[in-house]
Design a protein with these regions (language model features):
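Surface-exposed, interaction-prone regions used to assemble/regulate multi-protein complexes
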Residues: 1-98
């Protein structure tokens, strides 16, 4: 699986504050006020824990793998590659769309 450099640059070192799975939408809020929404088909792992620091994001077509500094991971299948992830900063400005 290749590292998604653009998404990794946007969220690397951000710390998870809250993790919610609402139907097919995964919401991750970070302690700095930024947030990520991912439209998923399924989630294949336990949720990220509060306080987890994002190390990198890898992707292979419909698979997205979040890797954290504490070695925890989140493996999800996205619905529409290139159109399933949005990351916004604390001012609600889009930093990543894909």
């Amino acid at each position: 699986m290749a590292v998604n450099l653009k998404l990794t640059r946007a969220i690397k070192d951000r710390i998870v504050q809250n993790f919610q799975l609402n139907g097919s939408v995964l919401l991750i809020n970070f302690v700095d006020g930024s947030m990520m929404a991912v439209t998923i088909a399924k989630c294949n792992s336990p949720p990220l824990q509060e306080g987890a620091r994002i190390r990198q994001i890898s992707e292979d077509q419909t698979k997205l793998l979040f890797e954290c500094e504490d070695h925890s991971t989140l493996d999800v299948t996205i619905v529409d590659p290139g159109n399933s992830v949005i990351f916004r900063d604390k001012n609600n400005q889009v930093e990543y769309l894909g």
